[in-house]
Amino acid sequence: MLSNKDPLSLMAMWGSVKGYDPNQGASFEGPEKRLEVIMRIIDETHSEGLHALGDEVWKGVVGSLNAQIVSKESNEYIRSYVLTESSLFVMRDRIILITCGTTTLLNAVPFVLDAVSDVRGEVEWVSFMHKNYSFPWEQKGPHLSMAEEFNTLRTYFPSGKPFIFGPVDSDHYFLFVYDDVIRPCETENDTQLSMTMYGLDRTQTKHWFSDRFISTGTETAAIRKATKLDKVADDSWKLHDLQFEPCGYSINTIRGAEYQTIHITPEDHCSFASYETNTPAVNYSERINTVLGVFAPIRFSVIVFIDPDSDVGRLYQKGQNVGVEAEYYPKYELQNRTVNEFAPGYVVMKMNYARRAEVTEKDSTDSVEE
């Protein structure tokens, strides 16, 4: 039984790691914080938008939250950076920062706003989001609580609103949204699919341990093939990845204006993987099942952001499935579902799934037989 004399166990009730053991040793915070700032381009805005800014600007942004840039890939639409803690994507009109561990992502907000100001843009949309932390007591200010995060964000965006998606004592997301989109406006057709996965298949996680850092090349290609990550990031994508020492793995991929990013924490007691993409789809189930095929998690959460003019948004408005519904995942049981509409047609859907008991039992038997 939990006691008030055991504060970490009490805090763990709100965390995302099940069965917290205070004697388990060092753990890494896999679930990421995510900040997206979208810029309204006006007549005075630099013709290249945020691409007019050099790498030194982004090094400063990343440094402000206690991370570093490790590698970069780019095309006409996206500059992609793999960080020591996750990823940064810079597009002409937006910045997406995704950071794990105990990084202080909100410390980067004034630096991001300076970047928007430097190219004479206007802030149109801001979202800050994170899955509930696995080890919330390890976080640093301003991330010690949702209240502190909200208070920090409200300093910069007074009209922004906070939301919680999912049960507070289990898998949930904190989301803050500042919306200054002038409607009616041009077509809104953005999409975002994000997945967080826990209790990864141990036959897979063994591949993400190493006695040294390994950058993009033949060795990381072999890791992708052995783990079937090459099914997610096939040859149509330009990619850069990093195998960490002693463990962990990150990959960014870009294709035109589309991106994917995957981050993996393989330790048994806190195994975790995340996946995110903005790739358009009429149904997300094929992509989600491909990712699940790599990690075979015990449980996962999926959250999708759907604009009204996107392919999937038009289907949703007609009452059709978008691929996050339970019928597409027979090995898993739907735990709960949360839906919110921020603006006309702009929908967020969040689902929690757990592997069915009979599937878990079969997997355990198969492992023993092997």
Curated annotation (Swiss-Prot):
Signal peptide: none
UniProt-annotated catalytic positions: 29, 32, 86, 100, 250, 263
InterPro entries assigned: AdoMetDC-like, S-AdoMet_decarboxylase_euk, S-AdoMet_deCO2ase_core, S-AdoMet_deCO2ase_CS
Gene Ontology terms describing biological process: spermidine biosynthetic process; spermine biosynthetic process
Reaction equation(s) it catalyzes: S-adenosyl-L-methionine + H(+) = S-adenosyl 3-(methylsulfanyl)propylamine + CO2
Subunit text: Forms a heterodimer with catalytically inactive AdoMetDC prozyme; heterodimerization is required to activate AdoMetDC.
Keywords recorded for this protein, A-Z: Autocatalytic cleavage, Decarboxylase, Lyase, Polyamine biosynthesis, Pyruvate, S-adenosyl-L-methionine, Schiff base, Spermidine biosynthesis, Zymogen
EC annotation from Swiss-Prot or TrEMBL: 4.1.1.50
Task performed by this protein: Probably in association with catalytically inactive AdoMetDC prozyme, catalyzes the decarboxylation of S-adenosyl-L-methionine which is essential for the biosynthesis of the polyamine spermidine. Required for growth and survival during the bloodstream life cycle stage.
Cellular component aspect of the GO annotation: cytosol
Membrane spanning stretches: none
Organism lineage: Eukaryota, Discoba, Euglenozoa, Kinetoplastea, Metakinetoplastina
Official protein name in the record: S-adenosylmethionine decarboxylase proenzyme
PTM comment: Is synthesized initially as an inactive proenzyme. Formation of the active enzyme involves a self-maturation process in which the active site pyruvoyl group is generated from an internal serine residue via an autocatalytic post-translational modification. Two non-identical subunits are generated from the proenzyme in this reaction, and the pyruvate is formed at the N-terminus of the alpha chain, which is derived from the carboxyl end of the proenzyme.
UniProt xrefs under Gene3D superfamilies: S-adenosylmethionine decarboxylase
